[in-house]
Swiss-Prot record:
Protein name (record): Cytochrome b
Encoding gene (name): MT-CYB
Transmembrane regions: 33-53, 77-98, 113-133, 178-198, 226-246, 288-308, 320-340, 347-367
Binding residue positions for heme b b562: H83, H182
Quaternary structure and partners: The cytochrome bc1 complex contains 11 subunits: 3 respiratory subunits (MT-CYB, CYC1 and UQCRFS1), 2 core proteins (UQCRC1 and UQCRC2) and 6 low-molecular weight proteins (UQCRH/QCR6, UQCRB/QCR7, UQCRQ/QCR8, UQCR10/QCR9, UQCR11/QCR10 and a cleavage product of UQCRFS1). This cytochrome bc1 complex then forms a dimer.
Entry function: Component of the ubiquinol-cytochrome c reductase complex (complex III or cytochrome b-c1 complex) that is part of the mitochondrial respiratory chain. The b-c1 complex mediates electron transfer from ubiquinol to cytochrome c. Contributes to the generation of a proton gradient across the mitochondrial membrane that is then used for ATP synthesis.
Lineage: Eukaryota, Metazoa, Chordata, Craniata, Vertebrata
UniProt keyword terms in alphabetical order: Electron transport, Heme, Iron, Membrane, Metal-binding, Mitochondrion, Mitochondrion inner membrane, Respiratory chain, Transmembrane, Transmembrane helix, Transport, Ubiquinone
Amino acid sequence: MTNIRKSHPLMKIVNHSLIDLPAPSNISAWWNFGSLLGLCLGIQIVTGLFLAMHYTSDTLTAFSSVTHICRDVNYGWIIRYLHANGASMFFICLFLHVGRGIYYGSYTYSETWNIGILLLFAVMATAFMGYVLPWGQMSFWGATVITNLLSAIPYIGTDLVQWIWGGFSVDKATLTRFFAFHFILPFIIAALVMVHLLFLHETGSNNPTGIISDADKIPFHPYYTIKDALGFLFLITLLLTLVLFSPDLLGDPDNYTPANPLNTPPHIKPEWYFLFAYAILRSIPNKLGGVLALVLSIAILAVMPLLHTSKQRSMMFRPISQCLFWILVADLLTLTWIGGQPVEHPFIIIGQLASFLYFFLILILMPTCSLIENKLLKW
């Protein structure tokens, strides 16, 4: 008799995706972040659902409903902080996942890579709208500043902003629609994840060497299910440590003040995971130029498969490219730091130099360096 997991129409899909999936025998811990992102998405959807049961998307009661969740709802405080810090964990895993894709040349699977970029945009949009919902000072002013950037679009800009706001300023209509979008987007993300995995399973996983590994595969279960379970344990430990010991470590104190349109906070800044893009936005003195740079800071990932000039796929055996990759990482950390600083000397010039270096590295230096390494192979 055939095993049910190999014959049942639904179980067969699960079997081919998680159990009998042929996987490269040498993929390292850097390949754990895909499953960790799945775990993060699951945590966010479950905690978000429970929060939505008690939250009210009205400007008069939103702030107090979040307070009510923390004070009066059974275990409301832990659900709220798991959701808030879960977002930080989500982005840590996202950045490491994308970084691994760049380092090991996984972007050459262009369909999987492009769906991944769409996912990144969707997660960023969801996180931004989620930050607006508690209706604190930083929520309100963050929403005002970021949505206002769309007014830089020629001709339709002003109408577009008012259409998104649902009026002439960020108000009740804005909060209600942000709540609606924040609720629906994670399910769209989950659907995109399925497409992401569909394309990945068409080609199979890459591995650290970047060499085709068809001759050396092992079943996903039990080898990588155990490995992923260990990753889950690490992630949950880190998340619970953050939630139980310092839940507000990554938040902004200004968001504990109810939104006041008449009083601007001294430094308007987004959550830490957007600071690198915010620094790029601020480094360009022109509004439209800044908005374009902001979008391109993520969209530039789409040109990476086109700029791959190396004869080798992975950076594992390319020391010069490795050096440039780690300069890029350091540059992104610098941009993150600058994004949280006030707009004054010397932060302005540091931000401009770091923004220039970011685009220069990806568009010019890394492809040129790959060509030089191709020449060195012949020596």
